C-alpha cells in the first residue's frame, strides 16, 4: 500500500474544512496535484499544501492508498468524509465529522475526536484510540436516519447521544458514556463496556444496547424480561448475566432491547 504523508505546518484559529483528505480524492494524482487539492479555511478556498507538507508515493487506486497525518489536527474538520476505500491514520487529535458518511476503508485516530465522529456512517471501520465527544454515529442534523453500517470503536470515553437515530452497524465504547446513548435508535448494536449516566435507549424502537457497567438512571418505559446469561447478538457471545429490558414503550410498538450487567445494576431490577 502506498503511503502519502501529510505533516501539519500549523493549525489555524479558524478551523479547516477538509473533506478532500481521503484516498478517493488522492487517487491518480501526483504529489504536486495533491498539494493543490482545495480545502476551506473559513470562507476562503485554499490549497492543501498551504497548511500541510505533502510527501510519499502516489497510487492510482484509492484502495492502494494510506494517508498518514503526522501530527495533531485538532482544528481540521471532515477528514475522511464519504471515503469508500483505503486507509487514513491520524497521529493526533481531530476535529468534528471525522469519517462522516464513510462507506468503506479504515480510519484510525490515535488521539481524541470531536463531535459527530462517524456521522451517517454506512460502511468501513473508524477506530478512535482516545476519547470521542458527542453524537458518535449519529444522524445529520434534522434527519431521522443515522449510522446504517460499519463499525466504530472508541477506546476511551464518549459523550452524549451516541448512536442517535442509528439504523445499523456497530458502535463499541470501551469506556464510559454520558446521557442518552441510542436515543431514537431503530437498528444496529451499541456496546458500552463502561458506565452510562442516564436515559439509555430513550425513544428507541429497535436495535440492541449492551451495557457492561452501571446505568445510573434508567428510564421507566422499558419492560423487564428477566435475566439472561451469556447472551448472543448477531453471532457474537457476551459472557455473564444481564438484565434484559424491552422498549422504549414511550414509542408505539417498540422492540428495542437493553441488556444491563447484573453485577452493576441491582438498583434497576424491578
Swiss-Prot record:
Q: Which organism is it from?
A: Methanothermobacter marburgensis (strain ATCC BAA-927 / DSM 2133 / JCM 14651 / NBRC 100331 / OCM 82 / Marburg) (Methanobacterium thermoautotrophicum)
Subunit comment: This enzyme is composed of seven subunits FwdA (65 kDa), FwdB (53 kDa), FwdC (31 kDa), FwdD (15 kDa), FwdE, FwdF and FwdG.
Outline the sequence repeats, range by range. Answer: 80-92, 99-111, 118-130, 144-156, 163-175, 182-194, 201-213
Q: Which reaction does it catalyse?
A: N-formylmethanofuran + 2 oxidized [2Fe-2S]-[ferredoxin] + H2O = methanofuran + 2 reduced [2Fe-2S]-[ferredoxin] + CO2 + H(+)
Is the keyword Oxidoreductase in the record?
yes
Function according to Swiss-Prot or TrEMBL: Catalyzes the reversible oxidation of CO(2) and methanofuran (MFR) to N-formylmethanofuran (CHO-MFR). Can only oxidize formylmethanofuran. This enzyme is oxygen-labile.
Return one Gene Ontology term, BP aspect: methanogenesis, from carbon dioxide
Q: Does the keyword Repeat apply?
A: yes
- Which protein family is named in the record? Belongs to the FwdC/FmdC family.
Q: What class of enzyme is it?
A: oxidoreductase
What is its induction behaviour?
A: By growth on tungsten or molybdenum under anaerobic conditions.
Q: What is this protein called?
A: Tungsten-containing formylmethanofuran dehydrogenase 2 subunit C
Span list, region 7 X 13 AA repeats of [GW]-X-X-M-X-X-G-X-[IL]-X-[IV]-X-G: 80-213
Amino acid at each position: 500500500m502506498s503511503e502519502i504523508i501529510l505533516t501539519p505546518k500549523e493549525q489555524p484559529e479558524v478551523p479547516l474544512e477538509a473533506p478532500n483528505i481521503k484516498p478517493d480524492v488522492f487517487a491518480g494524482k501526483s504529489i504536486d496535484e495533491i498539494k493543490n487539492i482545495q480545502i476551506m479555511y473559513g470562507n476562503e478556498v485554499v490549497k492543501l499544501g498551504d497548511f500541510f507538507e505533502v510527501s510519499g508515493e502516489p497510487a492510482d487506486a484509492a484502495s492502494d492508498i494510506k494517508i498518514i497525518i503526522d501530527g495533531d489536527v485538532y482544528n481540521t474538520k471532515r477528514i475522511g468524509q464519504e471515503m469508500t476505500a483505503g486507509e487514513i491514520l491520524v497521529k493526533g487529535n481531530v476535529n468534528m465529522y471525522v469519517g462522516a458518511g464513510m462507506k468503506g476503508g479504515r480510519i484510525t485516530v490515535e488521539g481524541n475526536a470531536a463531535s459527530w465522529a462517524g456521522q451517517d456512517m454506512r460502511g468501513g471501520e473508524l477506530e478512535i484510540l482516545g476519547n470521542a465527544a458527542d453524537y458518535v454515529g449519529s444522524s445529520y442534523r434534522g434527519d431521522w436516519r443515522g449510522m446504517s453500517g460499519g463499525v466504530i470503536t472508541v477506546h476511551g470515553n464518549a459523550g452524549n447521544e451516541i448512536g442517535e437515530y442509528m439504523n445499523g452497524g456497530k458502535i463499541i465504547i470501551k469506556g464510559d458514556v454520558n446521557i442518552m446513548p441510542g436515543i431514537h435508535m431503530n437498528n444496529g448494536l451499541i456496546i458500552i463496556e463502561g458506565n452510562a449516566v442516564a436515559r439509555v435507549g430513550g425513544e428507541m424502537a429497535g436495535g440492541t444496547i449492551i451495557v457492561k457497567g452501571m446505568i445510573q438512571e434508567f428510564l421507566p418505559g422499558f419492560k423487564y424480561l428477566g435475566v439472561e446469561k451469556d447472551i448472543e447478538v448477531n453471532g457474537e457471545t457476551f459472557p455473564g448475566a444481564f438484565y434484559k429490558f424491552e422498549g422504549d414503550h414511550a414509542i408505539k410498538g417498540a422492540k428495542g432491547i437493553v441488556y444491563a450487567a447484573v453485577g452493576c445494576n441491582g438498583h434497576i431490577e424491578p
